[in-house]
């Protein structure tokens, strides 16, 4: 397992260096990633500083629920294509399957590397929310435990969603001749959503804060797991345990399903 993880990590870094037909040093790649993350963090710090108004309204759980939603969305968006490439389009899939290695071991070695990437995106959204809450309201040991366990659960949940969506992407791309069209469509959609959110950020935030109580009622009624995530991050031990079990359970279920059909899917 350890050797498989090393191979997958080296292979992923090699493909990143070769993307676009140009060689780039590892230091340059790391530098670009750090720069992008710093830019994201600055935006999120400003965002969560404004969103602390929910905490003053007695809706601390909603503040953390929104943090969980954003973390999950960012992690899935940032990791889904890498997951699809690493799990289903890796060139050594058939070679590894021909060896006395169980499909679950192959999957786990690759997911271990992917979990690091998913964790980076997840924490990029959660840490600013945690920091702003701590700065304005302080923290307790119980809240910190809730933060740690909830973050771990969201990372597992995000990776499970990425694996499922990666399977769908693999199935679609295997039936499309011009794969560049899919990449172009994805890029255009991303730019449209990005510029819409960027140009309407102030209005969206204002509407969100004005509708806080209505949103809270809707979440409690129709999306209880999100309420549980928010309560767990707010220090509620039962909700923290529920969130942890949910994330681990979904990840285990998806991993089992993928392992059972892995050989058929990639060959």
Annotated model-derived regions:
Residues 1-93, 103-267:
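Hydrophobic alpha-helical transmembrane segments of membrane proteins
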């Amino acid at each position: 397992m350890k050797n498989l993880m090393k191979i997958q990590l080296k292979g992923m870094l090699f493909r990143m260096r070769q993307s676009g037909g140009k060689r780039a040093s590892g230091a340059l790649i790391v530098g670009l990633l750090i720069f992008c993350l710093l830019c994201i963090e600055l935006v999120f710090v400003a965002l969560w500083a404004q969103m602390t108004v929910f905490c003053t309204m007695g809706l601390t759980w909603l503040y953390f629920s929104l943090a969980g939603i954003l973390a999950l969305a960012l992690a899935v968006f940032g990791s889904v294509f890498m997951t699809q490439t690493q799990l289903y389009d890796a060139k050594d899939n058939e070679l590894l399957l021909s060896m006395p290695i169980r499909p679950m071991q192959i999957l786990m070695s690759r997911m271990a590397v992917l979990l690091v990437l998913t964790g980076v995106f997840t924490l990029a959204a959660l840490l600013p929310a945690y920091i702003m809450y701590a700065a304005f309201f302080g923290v307790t040991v119980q809240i910190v435990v809730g933060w740690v366990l909830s973050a771990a659960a969201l990372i597992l949940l995000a990776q499970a969603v990425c694996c499922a969506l990666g399977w769908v992407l693999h199935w679609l791309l295997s039936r499309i001749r011009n794969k560049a069209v899919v990449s172009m469509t994805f890029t255009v959609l991303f730019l449209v959503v990005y510029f819409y959110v960027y140009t309407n950020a102030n209005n969206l935030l204002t509407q969100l804060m004005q509708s806080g109580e209505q949103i809270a009622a809707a979440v409690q009624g129709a999306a209880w797991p999100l309420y549980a995530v928010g309560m767990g991050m707010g220090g509620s031990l039962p909700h923290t345990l529920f969130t942890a079990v949910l994330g681990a359970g979904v990840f285990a279920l998806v991993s089992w399903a993928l392992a059972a059909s892995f050989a058929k899917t990639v060959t």
